[in-house]
Amino acid sequence: MYKQQSAIGKIIVIFLLILFTINGVVFATSDPVIDKDKTLDISAIDAFMTKEIDRLHIPGASLAIVKENQVEYLQGYGVSKPDGTKMTPQTPIVIGSVSKSFTALAIMQLVEQGKLHLDDTVSSILPTFQLANKEEAKKITILHLLNHTSGLSTYDGQLAISNGDQTLQEHVKTLATIKLASPVGSQYEYSNLNYNLLGAVIEEVTNTSYKEYVEEHIFKPLAMHNSYADPKDDRNNTSATGYQTVFGFKMPTKQLIHRGTVSSGYLLSSAEDMANYMIAQLNNGHFNGKNILSPNAMNKLHHPFAFIGDSTYYAMGWEVKNAIISHNGWTENTYSKVLLDKEYGISLQINAMDYFNLNEYDAIVNGLHQLVHQEQPSLSNSKPFLKYILFDLLLAIIIALIVRSIYRLFNRKKPKVTTFQLAFQWFSLAVFNLLLPSFVLIAFPQLFGPLSTVTLFAPGIGHLLFIIPVSLLIIGLITLVQYLLKKPIFASRLPGNN
């Protein structure tokens, strides 16, 4: 058993190192919408998308490309549902944190109307808003929330995702015990809580629901007919089914209810609608003869404010790097990204999420950006599925060894060992069955995030990242007791051991 413990420990170490290192053909399925004066190489774009979707085993995707104030290309790829329904530019998909740009836009509309000021404190608008440190909470302003400089933590924002089945106002009341991760205004730290609070601010100031405000003041003026703040409003059930990656296989899953986090990550929109949204963003708030925001306010919305790193800044619902404005978003089973430069806008939506290959999804948008500027895209030859084959193999071996170790806990046979072997057994027990699993369990939130969120976003592997160290620790504790008692605890329970 002790040799098995050593083997398990070594495999766990290898597994964790690999984990930290990794951070069927699908064709276009709808008739493309193309601007007659296009300069895009549509065949190259379709070939690139088809290759990437096939390589990454993506069920379906929708693409929108605009240039200045014109739609250049709309296309759907693959399927939107398990029954084979085709993905189209009109298919709504949950857009994740791209929702933050809509919330920021709504806030700036209220600022322009004089109903709100960026330096207003949150507590002056939301009477129920409190944190563990009440005095610090009173310092947080609307601008702090927009720029992610409130001091609220990434961890607490992640935790809120799995507890979203409540109204925005109810969600605000749950923050009373939360501690700030840093002093208000001192540094950037991305947190969904900031935009959940902004959603509640919109409701308080307008005396209407976030859903109703966004529909009336953003979706309608921009002719976004397949966009929703509540999935129940999709009465024709055209929204795409999301897929999660479970041990490397894409599985259709149903999202949790996210009423309390809709303003930070759970709006739905289609490629066609996102094209209109991008046109407004590229044209100082102007779309089809209407202004949803003044040029000055739109400039503030895009202005780099909080330094993130690597020449990247956070504005209001957008990241800014070298004059490129973008934001990605992912939920438990969808992905989206919008990228805007001074000329083009690109929106990619995918009805799947692969937490361990997220960078591959981001790279698709980067490749599309190169293509629209007549550049060769940076192509990846990696096979993400092979990573999962390795993961699955390692996990299978670890689980098999754990099962064998559990079985041997019931075996009281004690082979003779040398002093060196005994010392190694103690070392193996201490490191691989006590110290290492204890460290992983204690540091789990810092290493991976809240357990509820990890298991939600990375089912299967996320569960095992917790179950394996717990199992090792239990085996280690039982083995330690057996050492001290000098006899197997469970041996007498086995047939033939009486």
Please give the residue ranges for each predicted region.
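Hydrophobic secretory-pathway targeting helix
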Residues: Y2-P32, E68
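Catalytic loop of the DD-peptidase/beta-lactamase superfamily, centered on the K-T-G motif
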Residues: F27-A61, I65-K67, T208, L256-N498
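Residue-level signal for well-ordered, solvent-exposed loop/turn and beta-edge residues enriched
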Residues: Q70-V71, K115, F249, Y344
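Short, surface-exposed loop or secondary-structure junction motifs
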Residues: K81, K134-E332
